[in-house]
Structure formats: C-alpha cells, structure tokens
C-alpha cells in the first residue's frame, strides 16, 4: 500500500507549529502551576500543597512533630506527583528563619544554615505547622476558598488558602518561570498591617501615601538598605533595585589595632562563601590591610576582620563593599498571578489584592455561618412548635405505626417540613416531654439575633472591612515585631549618574525587541563586509530596527504603537559585547499587553528649539515641544491621543531655527488661512519649478537645496505629502493632532521622514523592488492633501513597505516573510525619477514577500551624527528635569534575584 509523502517544507512547517504549541502549553503550565505565586496567599502550588497536607495530617501547632519524610510522602502521593527533593526543600525553607521573615513551619533537627549547609535527610528531621502557618489555613473548613481536584481527581485541594497572614508581602517570594521571573522582598508585619488598615479605610490612597506606612523591605537577616530611590521605584512601578549593605562597626582592640565587626549580612548571602571570598581577595592582594578573618557566629552573626595597625578601617571596608557580598543589590520584581494571569504589581496593587481576597474569605465564611445558623434555627422553630403542642405531638407519635407515618402526620398537622419532623421523631419521648422550654427559647432568640447579624454583615461592606481589620490587628498584636533592616541614606548621597563617566554610545534596537549599547570606539575598527558589529550577536531571523548615538547620560524616549511614551537612561541599558544581542527592552520600560516599540528618541537636554513630530497609520500628525517630555515617568504617559483603530507609526525629533520655532508655536488654527498659506507656498514652489524647467537644467532642479524643515509622510500605496514643519502649530502632550495626509481607501501611512540635505528617498516594495529618488523632485504641498505619487504601485512590484531618507553609504538590510535576508549598499539601488517603479533589490521565491527593511548608517555617519548631536545640544540651555518619578538604578556588581527552583 502506497503512502502519501508529505512535502519537506510542509512537514517542517507542521513540526514547527507543533513544537510552538507544545512549548506554549509547557510555558503556561510552568507559569501558572509551578513557578509564580498567587497574589492572594503568596504561595506557589508546592507551598500550598505542603501546608494543606500538614493540615489534613493534623500536624498542627498544638500537636507533636512528625517525620518530614511522612509529610513529603503525603504531599507527593496525594497532591504533588514530582520529586521528593523539591517538596522537602520547600518544607525546609519555610522553617528557616534566615530565609523567611516569618517562618510558617516549626522544624526540629538540622534544617540547614546561613552558611549554605543543606538540611539533614528527611528521615532524620521532624516538622509541624507553627501558629503563623496555621493562620494561612484559618476558616478553610468554612468553604472560604475554591477547591479543585488533585492530579488524579481522587481528592480535592484548595486553589488558594484563606491567608489570615499577608504572606505574600511579609515573606516575599522568588521563582523563575519561562520568559519571566519574580523576586519579592519581605516586609515588616506591623508596617504592612498599618498599610492595609489605611488602604482598607481609604481606597483612594496613592502609592506615595502607602509608603508612609511601609518604609521598605525588612529582611530576615537585617542589614541596611542604602537609599530610598530604589524602594520608591519598586513600590510605584512594581520593579526596582535596592542596595543592601552589611551592618558593620569599626572598633579598636586592646592592643590598639583596628578591626571590622560584621553583625548582619545582606539577604540570601552565604556567610561561609562570603568569608572565603574575603580570604581569597586578601591572598590575591586585591584588598590590602587585612591580617585575619574569623567567623565567631553562634546564634547571631559575628564576623571579625582583623586589620593591620596602619590600615585605615574605612578604606578597607569600602573595598570590601566594592568587591564582596558585604554589599549587594536586591532586584525587586513583583510578578504574581492575578486571576491566573501574571501581572506586575505595585505596592498598592499587592495590598489591594490581599484586601479583596480577605473580604471574599470573610464573605464566604459569613455565608457558611449563616447557612449553618439558619439550618439550626429552622430545626429550633420545629421544636418550639412541638413544645407548644406537646400533648398532641406525643399522641400523634404514639398513634403512628411507623416513623414515616409519624413524620407525615406531624408535617400535615403543624405545617412542618421533612427536616423539622425528623428532628422531633429523632428525640426520645422522655427528652421531648422534659424539654427545657426556657433553654430552647434562649437558643431561638440567640439564633434570631445571629442570623440578623450575619445578614447585616453580608449587606454592609464596612462591617466586613471591620471584621477583616479586627482579625488582622489580632495577628499583628501577637506576632508583629520591630523592624530588623534599617533604611539608611543613599551612599554618598550621589546619583548613579555622578558615578558614571559621560561617554558616547551606539544604541541598537532589534526587530525582536533586544536593545544594547556599545562604546562608539567599538565601531572605529570595524571592517567592511559581513554582518558587522551592528548586527553581530542577533539571531539569523532578527535584524537591527534602529541605530543611533547618545551619551550615557542621555534620556531615551521610547514610543509605542499605542501612543505612549516611556523614559529610561542610556546607562541603564546593558553594555553589550561585540557579539552580544542585548536584553529585551521590556526589562527597562513597563510595556503593557499588545504594546510594541515604534521609535526611540535620544535626548541629551530638554530644551532648545526642538519638537517631536508624530505620524499615525491613519494619516494624523502632531507636533509637541520637547520640553513637554521633561518630566519622566517610569510607568509611562500618553504622548498622543489615538483613534480606536489607529496606531503610532513614527516619531521624529526635529531641530529648527528660532524663527521657525516661533512660527511653529504661533501657527494659526484657521483652516482657511492655513490653506492660503500652503497654497502660496505651493505656488512659489511651482514657479521655481517652471523657472528651472525653462533653463532646461533638469538635473540641477532635482538636486536643488532642500529646506531643512521639510517633513514627508509616505504611504503604503505610494503617495507622499511634503510640507514645512512650521505650517502647523505645536500642541500639548496627549492631544490628537491634525490631518497630515488624505488617504485613499485601503491606504495607510508607513513612514515619516525629516528630509536632510544630501540624502535620497529610498523606497522598497513588498515584491522586492527598490528605488532612490531626489527629495527635490517631490513638490511641496498643503498639509492634509493627497500629496504626490512616490511610487507607481502595480501587481508586479507590490505596495511600499519601507520609505526612508538615506545617504549613499548606508547599508540596506531586506528581510522576507520566509526568512530570506540580503544586505546591500543603498547606492547599489539606481537613482530614478519620482514616478519610476525601481529595480529589483532582492529576488524572492514564489509566494514570498518582503517583510521589512532597515537602513544602517556607516561608521563614519555614526561618528558624525554623534559629534553633531553633541555640538548642537551643548549649545542648549536645558530645562530642569523632574526626576522624582524615575528612580535611578544602581550600577552594581551583583544582583540578588530568584534562586528557588521547584519541580
């Protein structure tokens, strides 16, 4: 029997699609069911299952400990069918007072140490829940949380715990998923309790307000957090970095020799490795002045570093901070599951999620109590009827031949239901006769009041809030303690920028969203040909999207397709190696779902005669003074207001003369006046055309000087409109803009160009054709007109996919949909007239089309652009930048990040 052979390309496509689908399912499984905690209880599934298993086993605070192996076996067998090592590590970590600010498990035996010692084997250690751990499961039996089936659907397990303790915030967490990670700092219970109190009573409080209550992280190992800027950024944006220093003291011994005493070390630092590192640095003579190091720790940490008599303690200590983990950077990234989806959470978000969860738990517990009280009240009402008619009830029961007949007779006679009649017949006759009427009435009245009270709780949110806060106060009063970590001043009270030399950098952004920076000197030795430094390190299917120069002190304005703008500093970007691809830009700006970077504008100073010009897909343009963007916000702001079906295409930073700048600011909004002005410009341009045409020097006409303030909007279907920047007024940030071009049906804007002297207009089509045209051949027209033809679009060449102003020595990279890539010189594409179709720039396979293209400047152009920008901005008197909402990251040698892994 013959089999149909699947073509190789089709088989490859099927395999690729199947692998993508499988990996996506695996990724979501890791994210949702393994690596990220639920924002409500702060637990990953393995933590939750360990706690629930201990609850079901009865390994509770008022009972004795049991072997850890028994707990681990129960967890694996019933709820978590993975390796025992991951489960035991989780159990052990919840018992370590140097890992958790508020441990949830009481461990008996060797559960590891801050020196990196592993816990003893699970057959030797014993454990049970402590009182704080029991709080996590309080009211679980009252149906306060949703339950779900275990892995084989033989049992049920909670999908979240009631969490009377705000575990997520006070204990923090860490974890590495697929493509994302979380690392949350622990906090002080008293401070968190006060913040929850304040937010529950006043939901309008801002993150700034809440920082009055939560001062900063409170690590179990104490130490000192240097500066509040990183804390502020983390609390307001969900991610930030804090510098943590060991608590040290310089003292003099009895012989007059100085020594350094370390009493607290940064969180998650291995003490034994720290001492070894110091010893290695002394041996390698990288640190001078140390004669001995001793670890005298017992229950508390005490590291003694003996110094030479002539050593300066402060200098030695500063070197230790510089080269060892006596100083670290803790990276905060508050990523957790909200409604089963990963979300980056600010301080207010963390507190609000917990408040909402606790209110839901209290609501469900109240509903459970109400249901139980109502059921009991229903029975008591039946018994009251029985006591009021005791003789008749006894008579009915005695005369009935069976229990069912007696029940039915009671129901018919006294209008009882099945439950009430069953309660009466279940009582012995002697009990019924001797029923204490007063006791029954007292219980009845009490139940009436209880039911009314429970209903009132369900109806009034303020009562549920009061109950939540009352329970929280009890927890804080009993288990709250003093802060261990001190929040100190920033080191030297200097900005990171003051510690970073101002150097020229080349920044590249790839089409896949990877960004990096390289010193401009890196490019000076670049040889011609090949992929070059600019593209080195990128994947074959990735290419450079944008390349520009900037100072390490420059701001980058990152604009997205949704019209938002984000700020970051150049020095925060990774300084990549020649063959490095950089890091995803989402690590530096908090892009929302569906956002894509459309343009990055480097700004050295917010001042001078500079404007930002925006163009959208639907032909809207806007112009804004650069100084409007001098108040950076890490969370981003709306730069331009977009229609529902529109998106931002391009942003250009445009410099103008003082006269042009003032004309731009004062341009009239009167459409008719504007039309007259534009018509006059067009007429003057046409007169110039006629005059030059009469001279017969067409080449001179095409190469005539171009005014430096001209903009061009290019569309997919080959139209282009060219107009002066000054013909429309600058607007405020967040405004909609005005019509830049009238689009035909089905057409859209693909590019915005600032025409530069000496450059040519390069156009690439989807069928692989390209052409270069002189800017002077494009007639200046009225803004908002249909423009002139840039490209004669036909089935042969296809629509335009790329239009840019380029110099002759630019490199052009063209990428097709099927992954074909070609790199050519821009000058290799023939210079033609404006209406020409162009020449074939890339030969495509059948069915393939050009996906995109990128124009890369030469090394000389990069260096010249850098020099020009520096010269221009050096003359600018910049406005003061409000950096209050952008906290500068620490340029540190090390970051403390996620380390915990679970199977």
Swiss-Prot record:
The keyword Magnesium does not apply. It is an enzyme of class 5 (isomerase). Its EC number is 5.6.2.2. Residues 881-903 are annotated as: Disordered. GO terms for biological process: DNA topological change; DNA-templated DNA replication. Residues 36-499 form the Topo IIA-type catalytic domain. GO terms for molecular function: ATP binding; DNA binding; DNA negative supercoiling activity. A motif (GyrA-box) lies at residues 526-532. It catalyses: ATP-dependent breakage, passage and rejoining of double-stranded DNA. One of its GO terms (cellular component) is DNA topoisomerase type II (double strand cut, ATP-hydrolyzing) complex. InterPro entries: GyrA, GyrA/parC_rep, Gyrase/topoIV_suA_C, Topo_IIA-like_dom_sf, Topo_IIA_A/C_ab, Topo_IIA_A_a_sf, Topo_IIA_dom_A, Type_II_DNA_Topoisomerases. Residues 881-895 have a biased composition (Basic and acidic residues). Belongs to the type II topoisomerase GyrA/ParC subunit family. HAMAP family: GyrA (MF_01897). This is DNA gyrase subunit A. It comes from Fibrobacter succinogenes (strain ATCC 19169 / S85). The lineage of its organism: Bacteria, Pseudomonadati, Fibrobacterota, Fibrobacteria, Fibrobacterales. The gene is gyrA.
